[in-house]
Amino acid sequence: KIVLDAGFTCPNRDGTVGRGGCTYCDNAAFHPSYSTAGKSLHQQLDEGIEFHMVRYRTTEHYLAYFQSFSNTYAPLERLKVLYEEALSHPKVVGLVIGTRPDCVDEQKLDYLAALADGSAMPGWSRDMADGTVRHAPVVIVEYGIESCYDSTLRRINRGHDFVTARRAVEMTAARGIDVGAHFILGLPGETRQMMLESCAMINE
């Protein structure tokens, strides 16, 4: 995955939901040096590929990882431009989109489903190392859920509840889009039993 900064912000920082962000939020702490919003997506991809080739020398294809802040927090037409720009890079075979569960809607998810089945970008293809040809990109949505407990979500100033997260995951999965979920186990106030119960809820 090549980490990208597409210049997004977050509704929990700009005043739409809250200000200051979540209590633990520090995007700069996990930014690679090549990933800065002042560079084009293609430049970030080129530099990210060069960075990773030191370790993964035989890798031919990459996923563009929209990681910084909430990467569906923009009008749909803007998202289309950004996602399709990343997918136009010849070594990119798919997208991983990190976002908040309160930053998706039916229209955005319908578009992502169309990307995933190939109908949004007809003619897009990639020759794979095993001799096959992909006619649709990989599309994965990763939600920052963090906790199953509303009391914890309030404590960390998350700005949404667990019902919102569950609904977003179900809406995404119902469209056949691959879904990932980020949790932070052991947040202040959570017990071992709560963590085990969280695992059970995640597995549902």
Q: Where are the language model's segments positioned?
A:
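Short, surface-exposed connector motifs at secondary-structure boundaries
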Residues: H89-L95, D178-A181
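Structural recognition of alpha->loop->beta junctions
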Residues: C22, A86-V92, E197-E204
